[in-house]
């Protein structure tokens, strides 16, 4: 038997039934986009025959899906009715089971009178406690669930109160036809019960919560608790918080509490030496850096004449210094050396000195 090489096998037929309608529409949109591209279709060997075939298959599958969905929509109310009936039958079965269990409890309680009295008391207490809670939470429950609970609760209580012998005789006679009639009647009156459950409460009438509290005077005796913010305000009024101090530069924390500004107003103004001492002490407190000692006297006040004389003297000294510096720079450029000039030399001087000595000796001899 001839077999194609690996990688050249024909593709397996696609199963369009497994894909959803959204996937089929997406594939159809892509294939139609390819068909609109004429340049791409011309380059294909089959001129887009396969693409057109897939488009036809996809359209047929989509139309078939739409027909099936339209038929299913016709039977949708019937299916909903069946579901409601199934739910009603299951609830009826549960009611029957509860009745049987209640019969067993009644039989056991008839054997033990002490236990029966205890059970009756406990049931009364639970019913009393469940009463106000049912009133408070009645508005939050859905109307449909409330209808079912209302319909089922009286039947359960009636069956519990009936003796076990009567219930055992009644259960076999309960036929399926009666259950179906009850289910159909409950389904027909479902909408009516929903409307009947809706109530509009007037503002003039007291609310259910108020009636529940009136039935229980113990709850009214309790004092209403104060809100938390009222407690905080009362506590703050008793113990006021002092206002925070404003931040000031170069002020120690010890001085902030003493309020130095008020103390200085009451005292007499201190002398200059005392102020200097305080300033030095303040600098020593806030920093370890200290000023260097002064080499000159502090600034003094001078008259206008003295200041003019000092300025002229300073200007003259400055000009002389500038002249010396200019002459020194000029001599360095011209390579001139300033030395003592003596054209006669040392001998002339010596001769004069000797001659002077001889003249002095001759004068002495005379």
Curated annotation (Swiss-Prot):
Signal peptide: none annotated. Residues 29-68, 297-312 are annotated as: Important for transcription repressor activity. Dephosphorylated at Ser-268 by the PNUTS-PP1 complex, promoting RNA polymerase II transcription pause-release. It is found in: Nucleus. Its main location: nucleus. It comes from the Eukaryota. Residues 101-127 have a biased composition (Low complexity). GO terms for cellular component: neuronal cell body; nuclear envelope; RNA polymerase II, core complex; transcription preinitiation complex. Residues 251-272 have a biased composition (Polar residues). Residues 90-100, 347-358 have a biased composition (Basic and acidic residues). Keywords: Coiled coil, DNA-directed RNA polymerase, Nucleus, Phosphoprotein, Transcription. GO terms for molecular function: RNA polymerase II complex binding; transcription elongation factor activity. One of its GO terms (biological process) is maintenance of ER location. Residues 225-296, 313-338 are annotated as: Interaction with Pol II. The modification Phosphoserine is found at residue 268. Residues 1-23, 88-140, 158-182, 201-225, 237-280, 338-366 are annotated as: Disordered. Residues 15-39, 299-333 form a coiled coil. Appears to be a stable component of the Pol II(G) complex form of RNA polymerase II (Pol II). Pol II synthesizes mRNA precursors and many functional non-coding RNAs and is the central component of the basal RNA polymerase II transcription machinery. May play a role in the Mediator complex-dependent regulation of transcription activation. Acts as a negative regulator of transcriptional activation; this repression is relieved by the Mediator complex, which restores Pol II(G) activator-dependent transcription to a level equivalent to that of Pol II. Component of the Pol II(G) complex, which contains the RNA polymerase II (Pol II) core complex subunits and POLR2M isoform 1. Pol II(G) appears to be an abundant form of Pol II. Belongs to the GRINL1 family. This is DNA-directed RNA polymerase II subunit GRINL1A. The lineage of its organism: Eukaryota, Metazoa, Chordata, Craniata, Vertebrata.
